[in-house]
Amino acid sequence: GLVRDDGDRVQEMHDRQAQAPTRRIPQRAPAAPSAPTGLEGLREAATHCRRCPLWEPATRTVFGQGPADARIMLVGEQPGDAEDLSGHPFVGPAGQLLDRALREVGIDRHTLYLTNAVKHFRFERRGKRRIHTPPQVTHITACRDWLMGEIENVRPQVIVCLGATAASAVFGAGFTLKEHRGRWHSLDDGTRAFATVHPAWVLRQGEGEAREAAYRLLLEDLQRLVDDHPAP
């Protein structure tokens, strides 16, 4: 669960980084020489993260972006190819589909804090192309302190998890998207949260009716967000 305790959690994050490697997260190393404070401090520290091997082939760390006091936080899986190259979350094809869905339900993207459960692009090469590969549990676990730090600093009223990876990072490994999609849950600190499909999953449904049906699921859940938590 999530418990808001900014100072303690940031300190614990660095205490754990300084420990010897554990079986759960190999190659754990300090993210930065001093404990980060605030979103910008976390962002800078994350650029030095070596907790898992994903940093090495990736172009850069892709940290979250958006207002530091955003009312709504969207959490995705990991950066894609476009995000890895640009350094900005949700700017590739999935991000463009998300933008379309947000516009349709009347949500201004610029009011949201957008981030991912994993901060580096995991991929495999096929010729000159870099093909997305889902992150493993070790990658999600290695990045979880960064996500928790973002949540604790932004303190959103609502968290929307896009896809199963984001949901497992926020709710825990036992959470299943099939069973809980679109249903509100309260985190330990009182933050309301729910999970919906990832726009990248919508794109993978091909063309025609299958994709439209998948897109309607995303729209339906975002509309629920608007209905249950209207902008002030």
What kind of feature is each model-predicted range?
Residues 1-232:
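A polyanion-binding, active-site-adjacent surface
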